[in-house]
Design a protein with these regions (language model features):
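Carbohydrate-interacting regions of secretory-pathway proteins
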Residues: 1-109
């Protein structure tokens, strides 16, 4: 479903769902370039979407982040990056043990 590893939470499931079992490292990659976002997991691209499009807004409206259900989240996500299309990188978990290693950021021209 759309709440598993590498998915776009509550919007797009990662296909294939190729996460490794507990105790093994997963390799993740998120590429954002001119509004196109690609999620990769364990050396396979698992989903793609496009920010700042009607499709993006429609996906938000069909999710838990809709304007009716969560107005602040909708506003932030629908306008992510602001006028300059810049933002932040965040690492998140929901109370379970989690480890990160070898984090790299590359600016695409």
């Amino acid at each position: 479903g759309n709440r598993q590893s590498a998915s776009l939470y509550d919007m797009i499931p990662a296909v294939p769902q190729n996460s490794k079992p507990f105790g093994e490292w997963n390799k993740a990659k998120i590429m954002v370039y001119k509004g196109t976002v690609v999620h990769g997991q364990n050396d396979e691209n698992v989903l793609e979407y496009h920010l700042w499009t009607k499709q993006w807004t429609d996906m938000l409206q069909a999710s838990k982040f809709s304007e009716d259900k969560w107005p602040l989240a909708f506003e932030l996500l629908n306008n992510c990056g602001g006028e300059n299309h810049e933002g932040f990188i965040g690492l998140q978990d929901h109370g379970d043990d989690v480890w990160f290693r070898n984090i790299r950021v590359k600016i695409l021209d």
